[in-house]
Amino acid sequence: MIYGIGVDVTDLARIQAAQEKNSGFAVKILTPTELANYQQLDGRRAVEYLSGRFSAKESYSKAFGTGLGKVALQDVEILNNELGKPILTKHPFSGQAFVSISHSETLVFTEVILEKEGPERDDR
């Protein structure tokens, strides 16, 4: 059963400006493994990666029902599987979590769906 759905749209230029203004911005958003992957990228791909991870973590917090205040950015990790598909590899939810990340020229759109076993009950 679906526990929560979260969506987010983030402006790539806003994330790029934040990273340019504060070089520690990526460190605050990304887990060590995500950061290592990010540091292998440059230019537009780096901006897309950072923006996508930020937006997906925002979507996750919405699906979880808490917002970013209760779920730290470091509590959620999104890596790519062998086919390049983003997957949630670390998160506080005990059920299954699914993520989708899509980019346009100027925006990133993300969606997270959380599923759990058992009767429908909103215990947030």
Curated annotation (Swiss-Prot):
It catalyses: apo-[ACP] + CoA = holo-[ACP] + adenosine 3',5'-bisphosphate + H(+). This is Holo-[acyl-carrier-protein] synthase. Its EC number is 2.7.8.7. Its main location: cytoplasm. One of its GO terms (cellular component) is cytoplasm. The keyword Magnesium applies. It is found in: Cytoplasm. Mg(2+) binds at residues 8, 58. Its cofactor is Mg(2+). Transmembrane segments: none annotated. It comes from Lacticaseibacillus paracasei (strain ATCC 334 / BCRC 17002 / CCUG 31169 / CIP 107868 / KCTC 3260 / NRRL B-441). GO terms for biological process: fatty acid biosynthetic process. GO terms for molecular function: holo-[acyl-carrier-protein] synthase activity; magnesium ion binding. Belongs to the P-Pant transferase superfamily. AcpS family. Pfam families: ACPS. Transfers the 4'-phosphopantetheine moiety from coenzyme A to a Ser of acyl-carrier-protein. The keyword Magnesium applies. Keywords: Cytoplasm, Fatty acid biosynthesis, Fatty acid metabolism, Lipid biosynthesis, Lipid metabolism, Magnesium, Metal-binding, Transferase. HAMAP family: AcpS.
